[in-house]
Structure formats: structure tokens, C-alpha cells
């Protein structure tokens, strides 16, 4: 019963970045946002998902996926993902269409375009208030992962309908 945006946000605001400062990346990959930009990122009627909402998506995808892994079913079937003979291409089974937009670390370095998709949740780390939960897909993995990252990192954002 969730409705997700089917592309990464492209809204330019304070705390958002173009991958490697190249604005031509924004059209397909969207912008990368720090945790502190999340409050103003989503359009009216939408919000950045919590960890619980990401878990609900992951559970649904796991229960309804085809023979591929959960992560593979959420990845775009597109050349934005690096592949080799051992890596399944995304199937976009659920229309989530995750692009491998990469991320910006808490300093000034950019990583993983073509290799990973990273998405904020609003859930903070209960042990470290400077960190929050990020969900990720990797080019060579069929799963959907979560871990805590610095709030100064910049990742893609997907919004979910209120």
C-alpha cells in the first residue's frame, strides 16, 4: 500500500549536489542530498521514508519478486549499472527504477556512480546522533542493504506518498 516516486529527486536546494559537480548528471541520476537537506527535499504530499517504510518495501519485494534477488528487482534495467557475466542486470520488476547514482562522502569526494544506489531514510542511529540509516543497492549484489552513515554524506532521495 505504499506509493514511491519512481525516480531520484532532482530538486536543487541547499545541501544538495550534482555528482562530481556535473549538472548534466542531475537529469538521469538526480541530485545527492545531505541528511540536513531532507526536510525541504520532497514535494508537498510526499516525505522521505523512515527505516520502517524501507523495511516494508524490502519485505514486499522479497515476497513478490521473481527468481532474481530483492535488490535486482528494484534496480533499473539500464546501462547505468555496471555489469559483468556474473552480475544480473536489474529487472525493475516493481517500477522502482533505481539508478546507480553513487554518493558523496562527508568531505568532498564522490564514489560509486555506476556501481551503487544509496538512499536516505529519516531514521537516526540511536547510538550516534550524527548518523542516519541509508539503504543501498550494489551492482554486484542481488540484495537491498542498510547501514548508518554520517549525516554529512550526500545520497539519492526517494520520496513516499503521505
Language-model features: where?
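Conserved positions within compact, well-structured domain cores
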Residues: 2-162
Amino acid at each position: 500500500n505504499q506509493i514511491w516516486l519512481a525516480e531520484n529527486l532532482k530538486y536543487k536546494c541547499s545541501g544538495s549536489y550534482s555528482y562530481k559537480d556535473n549538472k548534466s548528471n542531475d537529469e538521469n541520476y538526480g541530485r545527492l542530498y545531505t541528511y540536513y537537506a531532507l526536510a525541504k527535499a520532497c514535494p508537498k504530499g510526499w516525505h522521505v521514508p523512515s527505516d520502517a517504510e524501507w523495511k516494508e518495501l524490502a519485505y514486499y519485494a522479497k515476497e513478490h519478486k521473481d527468481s532474481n534477488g530483492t535488490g535486482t528487482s528494484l534496480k533499473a534495467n539500464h546501462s547505468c549499472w555496471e555489469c559483468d557475466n556474473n552480475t544480473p542486470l536489474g529487472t525493475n520488476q516493481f517500477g522502482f527504477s533505481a539508478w546507480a547514482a553513487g554518493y558523496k562522502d562527508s568531505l568532498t569526494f564522490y564514489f560509486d556512480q555506476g556501481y551503487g544506489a544509496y538512499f536516505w531514510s529519516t531514521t537516526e542511529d540511536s547510538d550516534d546522533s550524527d548518523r542516519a540509516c541509508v539503504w543501498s543497492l550494489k551492482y554486484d549484489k542481488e540484495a537491498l542493504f542498510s547501514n548508518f552513515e554520517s549525516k554529512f554524506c550526500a545520497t539519492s532521495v526517494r520520496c513516499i506518498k503521505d
